[in-house]
Regions:
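Sequence-structural signature of mature extracellular/luminal beta-sheet repeat domains
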Residues: 2-345
C-alpha cells in the first residue's frame, strides 16, 4: 500500500489542475481583436471590383491593386484617386476589356486577371501573378506588362495565384494553385480535393522557373520570411499555412506552420517578423446552429514567426477579405468581391 497523502497536498493538486484546464489559453497570450467595420473605404472606379491583392512600391506609394478588368491600378491619394498603372497586351486591343463593366468569369481570361502583386524595391519592377496569362513584370513607369513565364517543367501554368519577392536576391516565389482547374473553376478545386498545385521560384539571374514543391492542395498566398530563410504558403484547403525552408539544414523541407480558422487567401509579412493571413471565409462547423454560431465574423488573422495566432480581424457578416497589407502602421484591406479597398488607420 502506498504512502497516505496529506489533504492539503490533494487541494493543491486540484488547484493546479483547475488552472491548467481553465486558464490554459491565457498562458499563450491574449489574442487582440481589431474590428474592421469602421475602416475607411477607397471606392474603386465605376464598374470595377475585386482588389484581390495590394502592393506598395519602394517609395511607399500606393497601394497598387489588381482588379477585375485586368488592370493594375494605383492609388494617388484623395485628390488623384485611382489611375491605370499596368495592363496586359490584350487590354488595349479587346473592346471588352475597356467596356467599363465587370468581365464574367468566362471572359476575364481574355483581359487577364492580376492576383498576387509585389514590387522589387531595388529595381522598381512590379511582379504580377496573372491567373490566366502567367508570371508577368512591368517596370517602375508602368504600362504594358511583359510575360516572363507560362509554365514549368513542361507543364503549363493553369491558375497562377500568390506571389512574393525576395528583396535581397530579386527571386520571385509564386503558386500555381491547380494544374487541373483554372481560376473560374476554383470551387471544383475544393470540392474534388484537387492536389495538383505547385510552389515555384523564378530565378531573377537565370530567368528560369523551378518547381520547389508539387502535388499541393490549393496553394494560394505566398510570403518570404523577413530573414529570407523560408517561404510561407497559405493553403485555401485544408485551411492551413505551411513553410518551405530555402536554406540551412532543413532546406527543401515543407512543414505545417499553422492551422487556420478559415479559408486563407493571401499571406503578407507584418512589420514584426510575422504574417497577416486574409480569410475569404470562416470554417463551417457541421454541428453549428443559430445558438452556437460565432458572434463575430473573422476575416483575417495575424501569426507570429512561429505560427501562433496573436491577432484577429473581424468584419460585418458578408464581408470577405483576400489581402491584408501593412504599411507604416496602417492596414490596407483587399477583397476579391468588394468595390473598394479598406483602410484601418
Amino acid at each position: 500500500m502506498g504512502r497516505r497523502n496529506n489533504p492539503a497536498t490533494w487541494l493543491l493538486a486540484l488547484v493546479v489542475l483547475a488552472l491548467a484546464l481553465f486558464a490554459g489559453p491565457c498562458a499563450a497570450g491574449q489574442i487582440k481583436t481589431t474590428d474592421t467595420r469602421w475602416s475607411f473605404h477607397l471606392p474603386l472606379p465605376s464598374g470595377i471590383t475585386g482588389a484581390e491583392s495590394l502592393a506598395f512600391d519602394g517609395k511607399g506609394e500606393g497601394p497598387y491593386a489588381g482588379v477585375s478588368d485586368g488592370r493594375v491600378l494605383k492609388w494617388g491619394g484623395t485628390t488623384v484617386g485611382w489611375t491605370t498603372f499596368a495592363h496586359s497586351a490584350n487590354y488595349r486591343k479587346i473592346p471588352l476589356c475597356t467596356a467599363g463593366v465587370v468581365p464574367s468569369e468566362e471572359t476575364e481570361s481574355m483581359c487577364g486577371r492580376p492576383l498576387g502583386l509585389q514590387f522589387h524595391a531595388k529595381t522598381g519592377d512590379l511582379y504580377i501573378a496573372d491567373a490566366y496569362l502567367g508570371l508577368m513584370r512591368v517596370g517602375p513607369g508602368g504600362g504594358e506588362a511583359e510575360v516572363l513565364a507560362t509554365g514549368a517543367d513542361g507543364v503549363p501554368f493553369n491558375f497562377v495565384n500568390g506571389l512574393d519577392v525576395d528583396q535581397a536576391t530579386g527571386d520571385v516565389y509564386f503558386t500555381d494553385s491547380s494544374t487541373t482547374y483554372p481560376r473560374r473553376f476554383n470551387t471544383e478545386i475544393m470540392m474534388n480535393a484537387d492536389a495538383t498545385g505547385r510552389l515555384l521560384k523564378y530565378d531573377a539571374r537565370t530567368k528560369t522557373v523551378a518547381v520547389l514543391k508539387a502535388d499541393l492542395p490549393y496553394p494560394n498566398g505566398v510570403a518570404v520570411s523577413r530573414d529570407g530563410a523560408q517561404v510561407v504558403v497559405a493553403h485555401t484547403v485544408p485551411c492551413q499555412a505551411f513553410r518551405y525552408f530555402l536554406r540551412g539544414a532543413r532546406a527543401g523541407q515543407y512543414e505545417l506552420l499553422a492551422d487556420l480558422p478559415g479559408y486563407p487567401d493571401n499571406v503578407r509579412r507584418d512589420d514584426k517578423g510575422g504574417y497577416w493571413v486574409a480569410l475569404n471565409q470562416e470554417k463551417q462547423r457541421l454541428d453549428a446552429t443559430p445558438a452556437t454560431a460565432p458572434v463575430k465574423h473573422l476575416v483575417g488573422v495575424r501569426l507570429n514567426a512561429d505560427g501562433v495566432e496573436i491577432e484577429e480581424l473581424t468584419a460585418a457578416k458578408g464581408v470577405t477579405l483576400s489581402d491584408v497589407a501593412e504599411m507604416k502602421g496602417k492596414l490596407w484591406l483587399g477583397s476579391v468581391e468588394l468595390e473598394y479597398v479598406g483602410l484601418v488607420a
